[in-house]
Design a protein with these regions (language model features):
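Extracytoplasmic ligand-binding site segments that recognize negatively charged/polar headgroups
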Residues: 53, 95-97, 101-242
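A ligand-binding cleft/hinge motif common to bilobed small-molecule-binding domains
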Residues: 106-109, 245-262
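Short, hydrophobic alpha-helical packing/hinge segments within bilobed ligand-binding/sensory domains
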Residues: 86-87, 107, 171, 234-237, ...
């Protein structure tokens, strides 16, 4: 991590922890984010090709060049803005990707629907550096299909010059009429409905249809206060002071903080989502060995450290964490303490009838006036 950011963390994190998990220091969205090239099955002259489909703002692109230089394998890289966008592309058969990086709950769904290839870990020896705490997870119990890429927490980001300290601490800030038209809400169904569920005291993973409907009713009440529903658009709006309150991922908050030191972050008292994004290979993907070579490379200490220091997310690699600046590796939001973890809940896979309900309720929210 850049030294300037590490210094800002050391100056501000302590004050945030004193105020109860307050630090002042990717969902159905619009579609693909433009990437470097379209998927292809053509081979380069040197070592073939690997088509990678990842979230926006979620890689140090120089590591792609490093991978090609080391292996001779060309990377065709495209981005998406939500798990649901990625799923729709795969389910529609519209593209041939060799590596995808979905979140935990989406991995569970892809496994259940037989949409992933089992990995050959003989080709991924660097898997040994993955933190044992992140191996054999609930979403992939035997680690047959996935290798952790990054992980982290979701929380509330706010402008410290515009938001009163007495209003902090809860998800309720996103419903505070004082900040009408300065609130940004995340633009995907699982996260937005999940936030409303948590604010009501329910589980992210409830299958109680009445609770889900109640959560969407709460989002409809919030809608007049919302300036915009956003994904990566949140960067420009919060960095530029064009909105004062939003919810996003801690790694992205650290990126925003470099550009606007007036931003703060906290974990709501009701609890939040802890997630893992992992590298997988879609069923029937071309160039599977190239895909496994890419996954193995991303788990190397050199590539992992370079990537982590660029995008700020929490690394699953033990050697990388050891190499980070101590101010970063001891950051309790990047590498949560037990009291913070006690407030966290992972997303689980949901049955199809509940997924259908999410879709219809999300449409109800978006069409509400």
């Amino acid at each position: 991590m850049k030294k300037t950011l590490a210094l800002m963390l050391s100056l501000t994190l302590g004050a945030g922890l004193l105020s109860g998990c307050v630090s002042t220091r990717p969902t159905t969205a619009t579609g693909d984010v433009e990437g470097s090239s379209s998927p292809t099955q053509e081979s380069s002259a040197s070592g073939g090709v690997v088509n990678v489909y990842n979230w926006g703002e979620y890689i140090d692109e120089s590591v792609l060049e490093d991978f090609t230089a080391q292996t001779g394998i060309k990377v065709n890289y495209q981005m998406y803005d939500s798990n649901e966008t990625m799923y729709s592309k795969l389910a529609g058969g519209g593209a041939e990707y060799a590596v995808i990086i979905p979140s935990d709950y989406m991995i569970a769904r892809l496994i259940e629907e037989d949409m992933l290839e089992p990995l050959n870990f003989d080709n991924i020896p660097n898997f040994s550096d993955v933190d044992p705490e992140l191996k054999n997870p609930e979403y992939d119990p035997e680690n047959l299909y996935s290798v952790p890429y990054m992980w982290g927490l979701m929380g509330v980001i706010y402008n410290t010059t515009a938001v009163d300290e007495t209003d902090l601490g809860s998800w309720d800030l996103l419903w505070n009429e004082k900040y009408a038209d300065d609130i940004l809400m995340i633009d995907n169904s699982r996260d937005a409905i999940g936030i409303a569920l948590k604010s009501l005291g329910y589980s992210y993973n409830t299958t109680d249809e009445a609770q889900i409907t109640e959560a969407v009713d709460l989002l409809i009440q919030q809608k007049p206060l919302v300036q915009a529903y956003v994904m990566d658009e949140i960067f420009g709006k919060l960095e530029g002071g064009n909105a004062y309150v939003g919810t996003y991922y801690y790694g992205d908050y650290l990126t925003m903080l470099e550009n606007n030191p007036d931003l703060g972050f906290y974990i709501p008292e009701e609890g939040t989502n802890i997630y893992v994004d992992a590298m997988c290979i879609p069923k029937g993907a071309a160039n599977k060995e190239n895909a496994e070579a890419f996954i193995n490379f991303m788990c190397s200490t050199e590539a992992g450290l370079k990537n982590c220091e660029e995008i700020w997310y929490s690394t699953p690699l033990l050697s990388v964490r050891e190499a980070l600046d101590p101010e970063v590796s001891s950051d309790p939001y990047a590498y949560p303490t037990a009291d913070i973890l006690a407030k966290c809940e992972s997303y689980a896979g949901l049955p199809q009838n509940i997924l259908d309900l999410y879709d219809s309720e999300w449409t109800r929210l978006k069409s509400a006036t």
